[in-house]
Amino acid sequence: MDILDSKWNCSVCIDSRQGGRPENQDCYACADTPIGFAVVVCDGMGGGPGGANASTLAVQAILQHLNSCQPSADVQAALKNAVGSANSLLRQTVLDHIELQGMGTTCVVAVVNGKTATVAHVGDSRLYQVRGTKVLFRTADH
């Protein structure tokens, strides 16, 4: 578990557990970007081929996209484009490496700027907003 603080006045806790699988395919990163403090968590799907690669590539692609944004960029559009960019990279990687057919990852991204957190997510990795002991918000699996 990591607890991280940033200049954006937020604390982040990321919990990564291997569970019953032979390999932990989680990848996560936090970074100050031009549009806010970004937290990205990806989990390779189902222990399948290339899951660890998929989660790592997705985190890197998302942060690269967010870091290329102008400070005035629309955060919602930036998140949509960042996740789309990661998806395109994963699709191309599978085309280039047929042995990775079926690889994929879940994804949760939050960008905090001031008192606003903008969230994008795909799959069953969750984001929780907690204040004290109360869960204020949780993403729904899809």
Task: Describe the function of each predicted region.
Residues 1-142:
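PP2C/PPM-type serine/threonine phosphatase catalytic domain
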